[in-house]
């Protein structure tokens, strides 16, 4: 190659590198490849130092999970123990239909659970997917991490592994989750033989509240077998992230997955870098929402990467939203996103961001030495 051609090639390589760096930045300003600065002015999304534990759940169960996780951290315990405890509280709650016991099943009526856990101190991870009959998949995932050299176990293998450590098989259905699946099976198609015949569709069932076999709030939609409030389709999932007094970081993501999913479908939750990522030098991030989008964008890894480049957890979560929208809307301008991200860093900062007009402002429960609070993040790309 001539000297002139060599110079052109060199210039082309430099231009490509500049393009890649600009693309990763997504317009967020100059890219800084260094780790988080040792000192930064405290933001309004920062606890008074560490320890700190957060969850994407903002309901009463999420708050109880944070109370129990904080007891561990406040007593000098590890972030790893704290996130497992917090996740377990949510997993065993029969009223929570997004994870564990009482989660919504697949299309066959079988509840299949996914979970991942990551320990920043050892940079180790474990996960299970399509796990049946075990209420606390995050605890099984921890054993995969600590007692094997594997990262993920799936299906029957995951169940056999759990049984070998003494986990008891249990029916994961509650009356509410089973009724929701039976209703979906009856109503998901008008071309099969499930459900009441046309002439009985609005006739009240015996013992119901009189709204009709297929009537929900407002007279249309759904009702449960007991006439309770219906359980709507959802993506499920909760994240629990913590940093302890030694400034070690850990995280858990756990889910019952997409409601009525195809048997064996696995979302982002058990995939390290997608549904969960932890870097002990930086922080942690977790995702909820449409898992397929999160997998393709490696969203949790990307959030931690952005925090390592100097972004706050809030800014990094917003960057992940922008990344997904940028990729999808290049192909389909009508892309309708539905993701939520939460993140923390070692300095005690936290943030949350979501997108899609089917979500309100994203909320997360935060517990630190300052007490318990429910934080509202930002919502983007609602139209």
Regions found by a protein language model. Name each.
Residues 3-27:
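N-terminal secretory signal peptides and thylakoid transit peptides that target proteins
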Residues 21-31, 42-383:
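Alpha/propeptide regions of enzymes that mature by internal proteolysis
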Residues 34-36:
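N-terminal signal peptide c-region/cleavage motif recognized by signal peptidases
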């Amino acid at each position: 190659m001539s000297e002139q051609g060599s110079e052109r090639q060199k210039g082309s390589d430099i231009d490509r590198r500049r393009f890649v760096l600009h693309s990763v930045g997504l317009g967020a300003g100059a890219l800084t490849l260094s780790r988080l600065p040792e000192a930064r002015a405290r933001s309004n999304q920062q606890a008074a130092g560490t320890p700190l534990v957060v969850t994407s759940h903002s309901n009463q169960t999420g708050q109880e999970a944070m109370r129990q996780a904080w007891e561990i951290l406040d007593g000098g315990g590890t972030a790893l123990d704290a996130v497992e405890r917090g996740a377990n509280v949510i997993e065993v709650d029969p009223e929570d239909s997004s994870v564990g016991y009482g989660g919504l099943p697949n299309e066959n009526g079988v509840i299949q659970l996914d979970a991942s856990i990551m320990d920043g101190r050892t940079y180790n991870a474990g996960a299970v997917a399509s796990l049946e009959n075990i209420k606390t998949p995050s605890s099984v995932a921890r054993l995969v991490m600590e007692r094997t050299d594997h990262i993920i176990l799936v299906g029957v293998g995951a169940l056999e592994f759990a049984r070998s450590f003494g986990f008891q098989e249990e029916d994961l259905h509650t009356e509410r989750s089973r009724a929701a699946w039976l209703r979906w099976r009856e109503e998901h198609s008008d071309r099969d033989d499930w459900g009441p015949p046309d002439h009985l569709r609005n006739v009240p069932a015996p013992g119901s509240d009189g709204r009709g076999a297929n009537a929900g709030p407002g007279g249309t939609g759904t009702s449960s077998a007991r006439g309770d409030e219906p359980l709507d389709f959802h993506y499920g999932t909760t994240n629990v992230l913590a940093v302890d007094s030694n400034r070690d970081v850990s995280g858990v993501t756990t889910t019952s997955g997409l409601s009525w999913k195809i048997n064996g479908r696995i979302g982002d939750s058990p995939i390290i870098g997608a549904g969960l990522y932890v870097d002990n030098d930086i922080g942690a991030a977790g995702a909820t929402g449409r898992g397929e989008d999160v997998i393709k964008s490696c969203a949790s890894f990307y959030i931690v990467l952005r925090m390592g480049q100097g972004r706050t957890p809030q800014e990094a979560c917003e960057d992940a939203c922008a990344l997904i929208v940028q990729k999808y809307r290049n192909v389909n301008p009508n892309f309708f996103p539905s993701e939520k991200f939460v993140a923390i860093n070692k300095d005690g900062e936290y943030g949350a961001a979501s997108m899609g007009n089917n979500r309100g402002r994203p909320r997360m429960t935060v517990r630190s030495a300052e007490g318990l609070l429910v934080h509202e993040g930002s919502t983007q790309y609602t139209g």
